Amino acid sequence: GIAGWIAAIFLLMFVGAGFAFIIENAAPAMVLGAARCGGAFFLFRQFDDNDFVEQFALVVSLVGQGLIAFGLGEILRMEGAPFYIALAIVEAGLALLIPNFLHRVLTTGGAAIALALAIKVMSLHGLAAPLLCIGLAWIWLEPRLWAGSGRLWRPVGYGLMLAVLLVEMFRLFAMDEWVTGASRPAEWLALYGPLIGRGVTAAILVWVAIALCRREGHGPGSRIGMAAIGGAILFGLLALNAPGLATAVLVLLLGFAAGNRVLMALGILGLFLFVGHFYYSLHATLLEKSGLLAVTGMVLLGAWFLLKRSGTHAAATEAADA
């Protein structure tokens, strides 16, 4: 794998030196980038099980995408929303066309992040993450996608998961402004847009909890259903004041439902990150913060106890009915 990257980098440096005059203009750069993506597509299709060739083709495709992005930036102006929308379309097309797992993860993530940046440029603050969460929940909760086209949708699901966590992190630390610059949204949207976005994400979390309960045969009125939905509502309410919390819990919940350790690990990592940021950004004394942590811990322990007791009672009831 590493040998493929080294070989591709040296080859591209040599070719880039020879075609430096071409990439100074937008149209030739886009043509050259499309040609490299086409070459990567051919390599992926012809050498599906060759690690060296696959890594080589991945580097070639990434460079091609960079050239296409440069050309689009020259034509559409890199600070505008049309550039990011066009880039998202290109990345989504590559994710559909090129049949490689890692390539699809990266291009899906690139498309989702480009779409989020377009939403940011349009001053729709806080609305990118819930939009991506809808797609994330739909993919990981729909078994027919996995049964029919798992080779396509599995990497797309991973790419969306990485993108939504990165988008939340970028927004949390204002890193998106490094790319798009500071924008001036309408006053009401600047005040309430992020809160609306967190509320929508919390609603998605509750919807996922209801869907998972029904899939396991527990109605919303059952003990397990009420406990699960109540826990989701509790986390949703907490997330209104803790950016990123609902997204991390959503990823963790989807990972647990799918039995996917990667999703669970990244959900837990995101949970620690967003809770830590919320803790250190609180304008409170250390005593008040410690009290908040203690109360949160007791609430979580109480929720765990109720869920365990409800599960045991439900299992005993089913055994008695049988």
Q: Across the structure, where does each feature detected by a protein language model lie?
A:
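Alpha-helical multi-pass membrane segments and their bilayer interfacial helix-loop junctions
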Residues: 1-322
